[in-house]
Each structure stands twice: as C-alpha cells, then as structure tokens.
Amino acid sequence: MKSCSKCGQQAQDDVQICTQCGHKFDSRQALYRKSTDEDIQTNNIKMRKMVPWAIGFFILILIIILFFLLRNFNSPEAQTKILVNAIENNDKQKVATLLSTKDNKVDSEEAKVYINYIKDEVGLKQFVSDLKNTVHKLNKSKTSVASYIQTRSGQNILRVSKNGTRYIFFDNMSFTAPTKQPIVKPKEKTKYEFKSGGKKKTVIAEANKVTPIGNFIPGTYRIPAMKSTENGDFAGYLKFDFRQSNSETVDVTEDFEEANITVTLKGDTKLNDSSKKVTINDREMAFSSSKTYGPYPQNKDITISASGKAKDKTFTTQTKTIKASDLKYNTEITLNFDSEDIEDYVEKKEKEENSLKNKLIEFFAGYSLANNAAFNQSDFDFVSSYIKKGSSFYDDVKKRVSKGSLMMISSPQIIDAEKHGDKITATVRLINENGKQVDKEYELEQGSQDRLQLIKTSEK
C-alpha cells in the first residue's frame, strides 16, 4: 500500500493515478520500496541462519565457564585447598565436617585438637607441601589409590585416597584421619562420662580390665569428664597423647580431684596379720602396709578406722575423720591400737592356753595308750572312757575295735588348741602305725569336774 502525497488517499502499489484527486504517483518510489522490502527479507533469512550458530556459541561459552567453575570447587587441587584453608584458619567446624565418616563422627573440639597437633607435629608449611604433593601424585597415578601424610616422628596423621570421580572429569579425593582407641584400666569398677563425637558418652570399665573409651583422631587430648566408683563421684579430665603410642591403642592418664589413702598401724604387733582390717567410709577392706586405698573424692570428709584380732578377740582403733580441706592426692594417716590392752589380753589367754594344752597333753597321752591297748586286746573298754557315749565317734571306734581295724597311734603333740564354752578344738600331731606323722583335728567336750571326752575327729 501507498498514500497520495496530495490528498493522502491510500492506494495499491501498482496504481498510477489517485482515484480521489487524480494526482499521478511517482513510479521510482514504488520501485525503491520494493527493493527495500526484498533486502529486508534477504537480511531476515540471513539472520535466521545465524541464530543457531549464535546460540551454539553462547552455550559453548556457558559450558566453558561452568567447567572452570566446577574445576575451581571440585578438582583435586580445589578439594585440597578447602582442607588447607580450614586448617590455616583454625576452622574447626569445617575440618570436623571434612574428616567425619559414616563410622566415625568428628566433633569440632576433636577437630581443634587435630589442627593443633598438625601444626605442632608436622608444621603447617610442611603439611601443606606434603598434602599438595601427595594429591598431585595420586591424581597423576593410574595405580596408586591412597597415601599417608606423616608427622616428623613417622606417625600417620592423614590418609589421602581416591574415591571415585566428581562430574566425570575430576578425581574425588577423600581425606580421612586415622584413629586409635584410648584405653583405661581402673583398679575398681568405674563409670566414665564425657563428650565425644558431639554427644554425651558413657563408658563402664570393670576392675583391672582394659577398656577402650572410643575412637579418636590424632591429637593431644585433655577431655573434661566425670567418673563414678563405689567411693564416690569425681570431676576431672581424661588425658592421652598420640605421641606416646606406636600401636592401635593409647593409654589414658586420669586427672581427677581424688585422694589416695596410705594407712600406718601402731600398737598392732600382737594382732593376727590376716585379721587386720581397715574401714573407710563404712567399707571394710583387708589391711596392707604397702597398699594405697582409694581413690576418694577430695570434696568430702573421710572416716577411717582399723580392727584386728588377737586370740579370737577383736580390737578396734578410734575412728578418725579426715576433713576435705586436708585431703591431698596422697594422704597418709596413722591409726593407733591400745597396745597395753591387747598385750594384757594376750598374756591372759596364753596362760589359759598353756593350762589347756597341759590338760590336753595329759589327756592324749592316756588316750594313745588306751587306744593301742584296745587294738592289742580287741577290747573297746580300754578306750571307752575317753570318748563320749552316744557320739558318732564313740560308735565308730567301737566298730573298728570289733573288726580289728583300729589304728595304733603314738607320740601325740598339741599343735594348737582353742576353747569355746565347754567345747575344745585341738590340732594334734601323731605318728601312726606306719611310722608317718599326721595332723588330726579333735573336738572334745569338757564335762563336770573338768572331765574331757572326745566327740569327733578328722584329718587336718
């Protein structure tokens, strides 16, 4: 379409004269317009052909940009840089995330210890250099899949390994810290409570039994902890150092506010050693001068006493109280028996025992002669007066005499004797008919007018 320059009437391009005013149209203008339209159409065709190429080129640029972005964050070198930056900047949370595995959760405090251990035992500059070299060699190698970074003393501190690929192009590097098991060996059953892997943990260890408390990455640890024993509750620390271990375990040193008690007894020379006891906080234990008792909490008073026997009588010291303010890691205390009282009692009992032994010597001298006469004459009446009638021993000896199986005895010696009411227990050493020395234990009963009679006997 075109318009008349004189009246503005619209007309077709091929019309030569305006139907409104009769004005004659310029034919050159029509030809120019036609030529222009053809040029535009040609240019449009060219542009449509260029669009796919432009889109393809744009996509290629995007791919190249994306590749470099991925490379910056996912190449082995980039993965290495992330770990290095975290260690350099003491980013314990990032290090904990990088080192945590499905089987071993590393918390931020453990990561903090690990960072310090690397800086102390390897040196940051050396660690970075070793790590980059290790990653480079693994990345180039077709056969190697893992390698270790070590401390100056030769201990493994970081395992670097290939773990598949990232986005097809890049090796995925895995960084894992090797672990060891800290072990405790308490003297008595102990419960330990502490934080590990970001969670509260409880470990119960039996007395004198090696017990692991978990898995830890390299470091020098001082872990706040509580422990509980039969003696009480303690606050303190569990300490262990990977530098002090060349095995899969590391010994734990306990650092708690505790007191250990060493006891010295005085005035106890007349007491039977095996009878001596120490009672601490109402808990009775065997006494030993070389033994250390405890540990006990340093924030509570301790009560302590001792006891022992002499001639079957129990003697006790006064109970002492050790104030909490006086308790130290090693606390010594002396407990005193009334030695004069003990000696007087022992002297009295020894006189009684000597009197009893004399009676028994006389009794068994007569009994051995009567026993042998009964054997020789096959007559129970010789020995019957020495044995209580109605006792099982009475019937047994009578039966043996009748069967001729009664054994002859000689040279009786009183080894030991004790009296409890009207009953007497005596250990007698004899020589039997075979000439062998034997010890026999007899039980006797003391009747009216101090008459002694046998009730039973047994081999010692």
UniProtKB/Swiss-Prot annotation:
It is a single-pass membrane protein. Plays a major role in decreasing resistance to glycopeptide antibiotics. Its main location: membrane. The gene is tcaA. It is found in: Cell membrane. InterPro entries: Mem_prot_TcaA, TcaA_2nd, TcaA_4th. GO terms for cellular component: plasma membrane. This is Membrane-associated protein TcaA. The chain crosses the membrane at residues 50-70. Belongs to the TcaA family. Residues 71-460 are extracellular. Keywords: Antibiotic resistance, Cell membrane, Membrane, Metal-binding, Transmembrane, Transmembrane helix, Zinc, Zinc-finger. The lineage of its organism: Bacteria, Bacillati, Bacillota, Bacilli, Bacillales. Pfam families: TcaA_2nd (PF22813), TcaA_3rd_4th (PF22820), TcaA_5th (PF22819). Residues 1-49 are cytoplasmic. The keyword Transmembrane helix applies. A zinc finger (C4-type) spans 4-21. GO terms for molecular function: zinc ion binding. GO terms for biological process: response to antibiotic.
